């Protein structure tokens, strides 16, 4: 049985991680931390978990207790894992970080986007970017895994086949992405209030979103060179989901793009390339660790449109983190994640 610790268990990614781990046959949550809710039972805060974690209580972070776990997940704001990851690694505990702390390879670039110095630059070289469809073999050997963000997951999975094949003009990529409100986190913010977010949609961070350098980094690795990406995120009045509409110029009209995508993801348990002409819906992935993709070439022209949908809390966060844990410990990566999406 894998002994699991969770740092930061009161946010949406934390409770989603608890929900998924409750169904995992080879993992047990030993420690879950929250400074603000220390002493409170998990099942009292989250009634949906009654019967699964009736005796588990939130506690103040304790490196000794966390270090006794086989793996520790960080479901925290950026900056927290910087302070604790090194000590846990020294104790022999593996770390899976759902925050942005170790996603970017360049400490200076991280500091520019997050407005503070990187707190653990010495760990960046060994941090493995946890996108299994790209880095599965590296994940198997990792001590420290950086779980990709939600927008980066949907965008990279949608564009990588075109870039790996050298088909797309990498200098003119567009990612037009929509997110549910849970992507903004559980903290109280005016923009997330029902009367603000309901029955409305808006773009934000058009000048530059923190996920932009992460997406660009992944696309550069796929293409083997520089990329030019315009990324525009939007907030939509739904709770869960990411819908990415991706645009790339592909001059070669003889390529069977449907076959290209089907071949690239043929052995991927959590990527579903839908039949030609499909329009994937966010509701088709709600609660599931799956990315559904459809590829289109409107009017048979040079502009290719890829539609990519995920649940931002599952394949975009906690489900992908659990998928990484399964790979890390040599398990079937579908373990605890094979359930169907919720519908309606």
UniProtKB/Swiss-Prot annotation:
HAMAP family from the UniProt entry: ArgC_type1
SMART domains: Semialdhyde_dh
GO cellular component: cytoplasm
Organism listed in the record: Pseudomonas aeruginosa (strain LESB58)
Protein name: N-acetyl-gamma-glutamyl-phosphate reductase
Family: Belongs to the NAGSA dehydrogenase family. Type 1 subfamily.
Enzyme Commission number, as recorded: 1.2.1.38
Uppermost EC category: oxidoreductase
Annotated keywords: Amino-acid biosynthesis, Arginine biosynthesis, Cytoplasm, NADP, Oxidoreductase
Name of the gene encoding the protein in the UniProt record: argC
CDD domains: AGPR_1_C, AGPR_1_N
């Amino acid at each position: 049985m894998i002994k699991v610790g969770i740092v930061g268990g009161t946010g949406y990614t934390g409770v989603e991680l608890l929900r998924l781990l409750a169904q995992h046959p080879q993992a047990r949550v030993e420690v879950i931390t929250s400074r603000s809710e220390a002493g409170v039972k998990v099942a009292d805060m989250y009634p949906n978990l009654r019967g699964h974690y009736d005796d588990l209580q939130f506690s103040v972070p304790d490196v000794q207790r966390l270090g006794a776990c086989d793996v520790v997940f960080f479901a925290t704001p950026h900056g927290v894992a910087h302070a604790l990851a090194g000590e846990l690694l020294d104790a022999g505990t593996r770390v899976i970080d759902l925050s942005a702390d170790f996603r970017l390879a360049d400490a200076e670039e991280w500091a520019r986007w997050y407005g503070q110095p990187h707190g653990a630059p010495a760990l960046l070289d060994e941090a493995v970017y946890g996108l299994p469809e790209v880095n599965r073999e590296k994940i198997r050997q990792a001590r420290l895994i950086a779980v990709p963000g939600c927008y980066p997951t949907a965008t990279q999975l949608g564009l990588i086949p075109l870039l790996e094949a050298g088909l797309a003009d990498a200098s003119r990529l567009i990612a037009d992405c929509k997110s549910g409100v849970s992507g903004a986190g559980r903290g109280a913010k005016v923009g997330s209030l029902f009367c603000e977010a309901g029955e409305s949609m808006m773009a934000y961070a058009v000048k530059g979103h923190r996920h932009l350098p992460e997406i660009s980094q992944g696309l550069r690795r796929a293409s083997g060179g520089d990329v030019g990406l315009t990324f525009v995120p939007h907030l939509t009045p739904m709770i869960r989901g990411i819908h990415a509409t991706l645009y790339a110029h592909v001059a070669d009209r003889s390529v069977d793009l449907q076959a290209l995508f089907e071949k690239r993801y043929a052995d991927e348990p959590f990527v579903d390339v839908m039949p030609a002409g499909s329009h994937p819906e966010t509701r088709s992935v709600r609660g599931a660790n799956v990315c559904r993709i459809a590829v289109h070439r409107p009017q048979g022209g040079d502009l290719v449109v890829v539609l990519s949908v995920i649940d931002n809390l599952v394949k975009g966060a906690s489900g992908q983190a659990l998928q990484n844990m399964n790979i890390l410990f040599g398990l079937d990566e579908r373990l605890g994640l094979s359930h169907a999406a919720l519908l309606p």
